[in-house]
Amino acid sequence: MALRNNTWTLGEWYDQTVAGTGSYYEDNTFWAWGDNQAGALGQNQATSVKVSSPTQVPGTTWSKIATGTGYNFHMAIKTNGSLWAWGQGGYGNLGQNAGPGGGTLYYSSPVQIPGTTWNKVCISQRHWLGIKTNAELWTCGSNQGGELGQNKADVPGQGDTTDNSYSSPIQIPGSWTDLGTGTNRSYGIKTDGTLWSWGSNSNGGPLGLNEASTSHSSPTQIHGGGTNWASLSTSHEKAMAAIKTDGTLWTWGRTTNYNLPSNSDRSSPIQVPGTNWAQVSGSYNSWWATKTDGTLWSWGGNDDGQLGHNNQNPSGISSPVQIGSNTNWSSVRAGLKMCFFRTTGNALFAVGQNTNGQLGNNSIDKVSSPVLIGTGAWSDVGGGYYTSFGIRQW
């Protein structure tokens, strides 16, 4: 583990520290914390231990962490565009052309997915989507609800088995710029700005197609929303959010604990109050978002204090409420009932559920207002069910 030494001046250590002499880690190192069930921390051990502070995963060329919320499996991209996966792979979701048919197969250290031009990836419980630098969209894992977009829920060949899984990546036609996943469902934005969804549509119409329950096993356009969709985020509990190029924020799907502004299920997109939204991330029944002015907002369920308002009101909040008064927030990334926030100086903060040490603050106590995580600057972060990951910038 390489260390560098330097002398810092006032303001160079995060956004808020003092002058002094410090050490920082080599660029692009990868760190993990939380529950190691099924080797989910990528530490080359399968023991189900809890790690409550960041611990390094081998390698120094990591670039991007998968978005979404995987259940005991995770993925990340290296600087050379290679894609890696680890953890539980019983549905073929680790892309190794092996494993469908159960939940016992796992890799406790990262294994490479074929290809070297991966640009972004989003994971769900048992499947994932990935976009390459040429805008191709690929997918792998469980196809139980048609979430792999192959026009069937059970497609023979190419690694598929009777449990509907693909154990090696398969392409979804079209040119794509962004992607999102949920339980047995998938979403994508094409290069023309149109929004598409496919997979299971049960529990509130989470596909956004103005249908209550009809599932779709191939990409279907969400009509009425125009051609100006910019970015996607998913919420684990059957809901979805997306931001348009005009800075408006839209949600739809199942409502729990006021996670939708109407407090009722919505099978088509409905606008969230406010403008100038920059980024949104959701999980289970809560949402967190940043605006272009650097402010941080949250709404939805709050039973673990995950909204960051220094309380644990279980009744939830139905519209966005600002977290604190700072204007230097740059990104949000949700895990299950928790969220990570980065500042413009790439300091890392976390809030919410922490029973497995997944916040990384050397504790297992829940946190109801943002707490600083680790040292150094972080270029990316990701949260799963009970595990979390980060890439150090220095």
Positions of PLM-derived features:
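Blade-level signature of beta-propeller repeat domains, shared across WD40, Kelch, NHL, RCC1
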Residues: 381-394
